[in-house]
Each structure stands twice: as C-alpha cells, then as structure tokens.
A protein has these predicted regions:
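A juxtamembrane structural motif centered on a specific transmembrane helix
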Residues: 2-57, 69-78, 473-474, 489-541
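Long extracytoplasmic/lumenal interhelical loops at the membrane interface
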Residues: 398-447
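Transmembrane helix boundary and interhelical junction motifs in multipass membrane proteins
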Residues: 264, 268-269, 416-421, 431-433, ...
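Coil-to-alpha-helix initiation sites in intrinsically disordered, low-complexity, charged segments
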Residues: 5, 13-24, 28, 35, ...
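Hydrophobic alpha-helical transmembrane segments of multi-pass inner membrane proteins, especially
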Residues: 86-399, 438, 442-499, 523-527, ...
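Transmembrane helix-bundle signature of multi-pass membrane transporters/permeases
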Residues: 427-431, 439-442, 482-486, 510-514
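Polytopic transmembrane helical bundles with strong interfacial aromatic enrichment
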Residues: 61-65, 409, 462
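N-terminal signal-anchor transmembrane segment
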Residues: 29-99, 119-120, 126-136, 191-196
Length: 541
C-alpha cells in the first residue's frame, strides 16, 4: 500500500474517532441534563429538608424586628413627607409584611447569615421608601404605582425561590456540562434580544423585551447565567489552571461580543469585575478563603487605599488647586475682595482656565488623576450650598452629559441630611432606576448616601465570610460569582451616579424599580444565603 493511501486511511480513522468522541460528548451532555431534570423533586426535598422549624421565641423575635424596621422608616416618612407616609402605611406596609417576614423567616430557618439578611431587608424597605418619595415630584406623580411595585416584590420573591431551585438542579450536573448549559441559555437570551429586543427612547441599548405592558431587561438574566458559567469553569478541579483560565475567558469574551453589539457596556463591566474577582479566589488551588488570607487581603487593600489617597491629594493640588480654591470660595459664600466685581460663573471660568494652564505643566497621569479626584470634591463642596449648582456652572465644570448634569444638580441640593423642599426645582432623569443613588443623595443627603455605601460593603464582607466555608466547590464558586455581581453592580451604579464612571445605565439591587432587576436581586441574595447556611446542629445551639 502506498504512503498516500496509508495517510488517507489514517486521516479517515482520525476523523471517525473525532466524530464518535463528539457524539459521545453530546450524548453525555444530554444524559446529564435529563438527570438534572429528574432530580427536581430530590432537589426540592433537599431544600425543604434544610429548613428547620423555628422556636416560637425565635419566630416572634424575627417578626418583631421586621415590624420595627418598617415602623422606623414609616415614622421617617411621616416626618418628612406625610403624603408618601399615607401610601406607605395603607398600601405598602401590609404587603411588605408578607415579603419581608417571609424573607426573614427563610433566613432564620435555613441558618443563613442574619446580618446579611438584615441588610437586605433594610435595602428592600429603603427601596420602597425611595419609590414613594418620588411621588413628591410632579414629573413622577402617577408614574410610580405602589400596588404594581408591591406586586413585583411579591412575585420576585417567589420567582427567586424557583430560580434557587433551578440552580440547585443545575449544580447536580458535571461542572463542564452545567457551564455549557448555562452558556446556551445565555446565548438564547442574546438572540431573543437581537430579534425582538427594544431600546427605550434616547438609548442605543437593545436590552429590553416588551410583552404587552410587561418589559424585561433580559441582559440582567444573561448576566447571572454568564457569571455562574464562568464560576463553574474556573473552579473545575478536573481541568488544569491554564485550561480553566482560557475557557472562562472565552465565556467572558463571547458575552462581551454580544453585549457590545447590544450596547450594554455596563453589564459587560460587571461581568469583567466578576471574572477578575473569581480569578483572585480560585486560580490558586484552594477550596476556601481562610480568615488569615482574608485579613491579609483587607490589610493590603487598606495600605493601597492610603497610598492612593495621598497620591490623589498630591495630584488634586497639582492639577486642580486653582479650581478647588475658587469653588470653595463660591460654596462658602465668602465675601468678595474689594474691587472684585466678577460673577460666580466668571470665577468658575477663570478657575477652569487656570486648571488648563496647570495641566500643561503636569504629567498626563497626574492631571488625569487630579481631575477624577476633583469630581468627588465637587460633590462634597456643592453640599455646602443648599440650592446646588446651576446648569451653566455644571457645564463650566465639564459635565456635559444631560442626565448626569441634571441628577448631580439635584443630588448636590440634598446637603448632608436631604431636602424635601422645591422637589421640582431640578427635574431628575430616570431617578427611579439608573440614577436612584442620585435621588438617595437628594432625598436623604450625604449621610444617606454614605449609609447605602456602607451597607453595600457590609454585604461584601458578610458574604465573603460565609461563602469561604462552603463545602461544595461548585456551590461556593457560584455563590461568589453572585455576590460579586450583586455588590459590583451596586458599586458601579454608585460611581456612575456621582460621575466617577461614565453613565452605564445599570439599576441598583432593591433600590431601583424594575421587573428583571427585582427578580435577579432576590435570586442572588437567596442563593448566597442558602449556600452559606449552617447545619441544623449549629443553628440549634
């Protein structure tokens, strides 16, 4: 037999072997999916079995704590906006009892982190309060339906429990098969948006699927599926470190292509942050984050933050010293020097001109960092003037985005403790969703904004503490992915609302209004709480 004939026969055998291997892989994948479907009753029984009955005293303490939380926020509304308080007590509070008490009892029954659950309950009530306070705006009067908002919370809690059961079944598959299955569902969401997706007026992101009066932001669902797929791949111990790294990056890159085509760069930013955090946790071969490692990590972060703060102060002084001095003078209403007849706008324009001159003598990095730090300083300095900045002054300071400009003007007028007068002086844009943190600064002031930021960081710390001790590696990985997606999106939304990042159009968990956002928020926290549950023996102690 000639050599070409032998080579042709060998190639044919190789092709047949590849085809047979592919068929076998597909068959195993389908068999794994069928097994996961058949395990639904078993997974449901497992979830029910992990919920232990509560003692009467424990249940009463839980109910009393939730009622006290809602009463405290109701009293705050009664003092600030009596009209909104009437809606709160007559419509929102009765149904919120069913949502909050059911959620709190689930946390206690499954042995979840009580602190984590209490923070989530506070965010839920705060979201209800903010949506009701929006009714004080003439532009939002009638736009926020309390009954509809309440129904969304009830349905979202039930849907979140069903989604928790879905992921419990998916985790019964092999890690690689589960990742492929979730990736296929993610691709299906993107294809549906390409064919049937729509974009709100004034945006280019085709992220919504409208079915009659109902609209769903499918990219929120795709984000969760993609994050879980990356977590399963990157935590798969059956693969080498290089293979896990490349496959997880391939999932991120594929999602990046779809999201860029849809115009959803904010969701891509969240997934990138989740990917980076998962790499930090799982690329070293360790099954959990030990407390010592976690303390070292926070210590390193603290040192880095101190260095960044010092460097930022130097950059701010070098690149924006003139602007800071003049704006501080404007905000404190300092008396003008004799013979100084310049207006406020002229002073700001002169400060900006001196800032540009200083930039010519600074290194590009120093000037860039100084301008970013200035965005934060502008917010702090503006708090000293109750009516905030005018539209012309915001333009003079370089804020040319209309939505960000209007919302920053309104946020600056909130001061440190919020302001309820002249609610229509600044027409806020998308304050119920994407710019809800700007409305927090407007209605609750800087203190309220700091409280929301601290609660977000507390979610990260509590979640890390519990998830680091989870026995199942796949469950721990998905829990970490959900935690970083939840907290990461909240931090990105906060940064975008105060001008540290470009406008990304992302909602905040529990504070923003939205169908898909509400469902996904409940799913994320329920999965994190259930994954970090303690055994019944530990709970009963």
């Amino acid at each position: 037999m000639s050599r070409p004939t032998v080579l042709a026969a060998a190639e044919g055998k190789k092709d047949w072997h590849v085809l047979r291997t592919s068929r076998e892989a597909v068959r195993l994948f389908i068999a794994d999916m069928v097994h996961a479907v058949r395990c639904v009753p078993e997974a449901l029984a497992e979830v029910r079995g992990s919920l232990h009955p509560l003692r009467a005293k424990q249940a009463l303490e839980t109910v009393f704590a939730e009622l006290l939380l809602m009463a405290a926020f109701g009293l705050y509304l009664l003092l600030r906006l009596p009209a909104a308080a009437d809606l709160y007590f007559s419509i929102m509070m009765p149904a919120a009892i069913f949502v909050l008490i059911a959620f709190a009892l689930f946390v206690q029954s499954c042995g979840g982190d009580v602190t984590f659950g209490l923070i989530v309950s506070t965010l839920i009530v705060l979201g209800i309060v903010l949506q009701l306070m929006l009714t004080a705006y003439a532009a939002y009067a009638g736009a926020t339906s309390p009954r509809r908002f309440l129904v969304i919370h009830c349905v979202s809690l039930i849907t979140g429990l069903l989604a928790l059961l879905f992921f419990r079944c998916v985790l019964r598959m092999r890690a690689v098969h589960a990742a492929v299955f979730l990736s296929l569902l993610t691709a299906a969401c993107y294809l549906i948006l390409f064919v049937f997706g729509s974009a709100p007026a004034g945006t280019n992101a085709r992220a919504w699927l409208c079915i009659g009066p109902l609209s769903l932001q499918l990219t929120e669902i795709a984000k969760v599926l993609a994050a879980a797929a990356m977590a399963l791949v990157i935590s798969d111990t059956d693969r080498s470190g290089k293979a896990r790294l490349l496959r997880s990056f391939a999932i991120l890159a594929a999602n990046g292509v779809f999201l860029a085509a849809l115009g959803e760069l904010g969701t891509l930013l969240v997934l990138t942050l989740v990917y980076a955090c998962l790499l930090f946790v799982f690329c070293p071969d360790r099954t959990e984050l030990r407390r010592a490692t976690l303390l070292k990590m926070f210590g390193a972060v603290a040192v880095i933050l101190v260095c960044v703060a010092v460097f930022s102060a130097v950059c701010l002084r070098a690149s924006n010293g003139a602007k800071v001095a003049v704006i501080r003078e404007v905000r404190t209403a300092a008396p003008a020097v004799d013979g100084d007849t310049r207006t406020i706008d002229e002073k700001i324009a002169a400060a900006c001109a001196r800032d540009k001159e200083a930039a010519k003598t600074c290194a590009p990095l120093i000037n860039r960092v100084g301008n970013e730090v200035w965005k934060v300083c502008r917010r702090v300095l503006a708090m000293k003037k109750p009516e905030g900045l005018t539209d012309e002054q915001m333009l003079a300071l370089g804020v040319d985005n209309y939505q960000l400009r209007r919302n920053n003007m309104a946020a600056a007028s909130g001061g440190w403790f919020g302001s309820s007068y002249e609610m229509d002086r600044y027409t806020m844009v998308v304050a119920e969703s994407d710019f809800v943190f700007a409305f927090v600064l407007r209605a609750l002031g800087g203190v309220g904004g700091i409280a929301v930021l601290l609660m977000t960081l507390a979610l990260l710390i509590c979640g890390n503490r519990r998830l680091g001790a989870v026995a199942g590696r796949a469950e721990m990985a998905v829990g970490y992915a959900f935690l970083y997606a939840l907290v990461g999106q909240m931090l990105i939304c906060i940064a975008a609302n105060i001008g540290l990042l470009p406008t990304v159009g992302l909602p905040m968990a529990f504070l923003s209004r939205g169908n898909a956002n509400s469902v996904i928020s409940y799913l994320l926290v329920l999965f994190i709480l259930y994954a970090g549950r303690r055994p019944q023996k530990e709970v009963s102690r």
